[in-house]
Every structure is written in structure tokens, then in C-alpha cells.
Amino acid sequence: MAKTASDISLTRQAMSLTEDLMTPNAAIYWADLTISAAVMWGGFLIAATTSSLALGLGAALLSMLALYRGLSFIHELTHIRDDEAPGFRVGWNVLVGVPLMTPSLMYEGVHNIHHIKDRFGTRLDPEYLPLSRFTPLKLAGFLFIALLAPLGVILRSAILIPLSFLVPSLRRYLKTKLSALIINPDFVREDLGRWRKAWVIQDVACWLWSWAVIAGLGLGVVPVRVVLTGLAIFSLATFLNQARTLVAHHWDNDGDKMTLEEQFLDSVNVPPPNLASALWAPVGLRYHALHHLLPRLPYHNMAKAHARLVEALGADSLYHRASEPGLFEALGDLFRRVRQKNAEARNQPAH
């Protein structure tokens, strides 16, 4: 895949304008994660125990948004080194990853493939599907299936993980097909030899946590309401993330290799003045096109980097073509393109 002049120009310009913003600030990472986890667990506790419906719903909403934000740090873990935020990976797994049965290794070693230039948008990309070519019903199914994600991680942690330690073939299947946060169902993990010890530690931790909750529920120590509240909050967070996923790209590629320009223009920013995007696309995810341009840029510097690029790059720059005004506008555009492509397919003469 050859680079075009515009590919090189935009990348070089962006790197030149933001080279002083590439260092992660560990204090910001830790403070953000700690506050997010505190709000997540505190809101959950209130929602699961209060007798006030209004207070319970408000607390659940705050908990859901904080859970979503905390869980989104799994994306940052794939782009920062351990020495840039010492202990952060372990801290995240303790506060968020293991309790949600979504440990960091379900994304580490996977997301980086999405950034490999000759894999992006192809059938080898774990995070890409030609969604704009789906039928409207299939696209809606893709969105709403996310509500079942918590049940999936419970099944994986409570049943499949312990069984996999007894059945080697199941262990291999679990790691290759059921241990990655992906949207491409054909993706198969190939990094089985990496992080062997970490895999065991994270899987066993999720297994024991799930069994502890189930045992507490069976013994009456953990009320049913607590479990149902937790599942509802988790489900809504995964649904919101799936909605965000739908607007992270335009999803127009059908498996062919793309130039860097095509990859960038297939990606989407939802920048200010849209303030709501900080809630539904937290931890820098609202600058998704910028992230594909500069994958090493830490989330806390993305707003500043975006502002610099908007100011410095000319009106004819590709960079300005990557922005959408908001979530509903971008979703509406996707569903319009889906309907249009389906109509065009129906009108094509049969061969």
C-alpha cells in the first residue's frame, strides 16, 4: 500500500505540531481512573440499596457513565508503556477489569492490529466490519446485541475459564476466539505465546471473582437486587459503547487495503462545541480520527492537539473532513447510507 503525498503531508504536519504533547501524565491517568472507579462503585452501591426511585436512577446513571469511562481506559493501556504510568495496568485490572470480568489482555495484543496500516479495514482487522453495507435490521441487531455483553463475560469467567484449565483444546479455543474485544467474528488471536503468566493470573482472578459473586448470591449474602442493578448498569454501558463504535468510523470499506488517507477519512472526530461527546466517547474516544493519525498521543492531550491542528492546518486540509457534529447526526448518516446502499443493491439487475 503506497503512501500518497497527502498521507505523508498530513501525518508529518500533525506530528510536528504535537510533538510536545506525546508524553503521558501518570498523575492524570491515576486521578482520572481513581475518581471514575469511586463514582462507579459509589453510584452502584446507592442505586442498589436506596429506597428512592429518583435517587436510585440518578445514581445508576452516574455509575453507568463512570463505569463506561473507567472501562474505556483499557484502550489507553494498549498505547502506553508500563514505565510511563507505573502500576497503572495492575491498578486498572483491580479496580475495573477483573470486577467487570473484562481484563486488560482481552484488548492488549488485539487493538494494536487495528492500527497496522495494511490490516486496517481488511478482513484481518479485529475491529472493522463493512457496517454501512449491512441491512438496517442487521445493523440494529449489531447495536442491541451489546446489551448481552455482561452475560457473555459471566459465562466466560464462571464456566469456560475453569473448564479450559481441564480441557486443553477448550483452553486454546477460549484464548483464540473468546478472549478479545472485537467486532469481527472471523478474527482469531495468534499471540498465544505472549503473557502466559499474566493470562493465567487474569483469568483465574475473573474466575474466582465470578464464583464469589455467585456464591454470595446463592447464600443470600449478596441480594438479587444488587446483582440485577449491576447487570443493568453494565449492560447500558456496553450499549452506549456500541453506539459510539457505530460512529467511530464510516465503515465503508469492504475488505480491501486502504491508503492512509482513506483510513483517516473513514475515521471520525466529534469535537467541541459538542460537549456531550465527552460523556458518550470518553477518555479521548471522541477524537477517533486524530487517534488514528497519532496513535501514541495520550488522551488528556487530544483536545489541545485537535485545537492546534484546526488552527494551523489550512481550510483545504484533509483533517477538517473527519469531523461529525454529534452522535445522533453521525448515527443518522450511517443509517441513511445503509438504506441507500441496500436500495442500490435491490435495483441492480440480476445476472
Curated annotation (Swiss-Prot):
Pfam families with a match to the protein in the record: FA_desaturase
Signal peptide from the UniProt entry: none
GO terms for cellular component: plasma membrane
Membrane topology of this protein: Multi-pass membrane protein
Pathway stated in the Swiss-Prot or TrEMBL entry: Lipid metabolism; sphingolipid metabolism
Family to which this protein belongs: Belongs to the fatty acid desaturase type 1 family.
Role summary: Involved in de novo bacterial ceramide synthesis.
Protein's recorded name: Ceramide hydroxylase
Organism of derivation: Caulobacter vibrioides (strain NA1000 / CB15N)
Lineage: Bacteria, Pseudomonadati, Pseudomonadota, Alphaproteobacteria, Caulobacterales
